[in-house]
Amino acid sequence: MSNSYEKPLNDDEFVELGELLVAMPEPFEPMEPDYMDGFLTALLCLPDEPSPGDWMPYIFDSQARQDAALADPDEQDRLEELIYRRYRSIDTTLARCRPIDPIIYEIEDNRGRPVRGADSVAAVIPFALGFSEVINRWEGLKDSTDDRINGALLGILRHLPDDVAGDLAEIKADLDLESPIENLDQALEDIAESVAEIAAVTRGFEKKEEPPKKKPAPKGPRRPQGGRRH
């Protein structure tokens, strides 16, 4: 695999990715980047990852029609490169046990200002929808009997809209009542922890506890320390 695929996307390339996706001609229905990020993240949480040839057509078109492509072959190649680099970047993040940093578009008020508080949490809905598509399309997560996986899935799927939550609607309501998410930052942190928990089970990406460093023994009597306490 070329090292170029290991290079994370920069800010301009994230914009380019969105522009190429929206340029997909009709009648095809491509994913939007924030939805796609949930989709890719879920793929990388599966115990058995499908090949790119199996999942990439769904990014270009909701029905995975095989002729879904940009009119310019060079632009199509570029789009596929950006998608795969994003996929590899998420994989590297998970493998290094670092929190994911998903593509999110903040919710804005009628003056174009980002909303705050509980209303801002709606920005993670596309991520949850993309994640949900994968677990409904491929085996390994939704059908899991592992308590850690099932509990962590709720941390993501609780953000599904009420009209698609299905059997989770009652559990979702209980979570919103007992453990409400107060803002977007908290939602992103909760999702990152949930994804890490799933990847720890399905792919063995457990963060290793580092042994405490031994402090050197004092060489002589220590003088009392004055000053403020921190």
Enumerate the predicted regions with their spans.
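Domain-length accessory/inserted modules outside core catalytic folds
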Residues: 1-128, 132-230
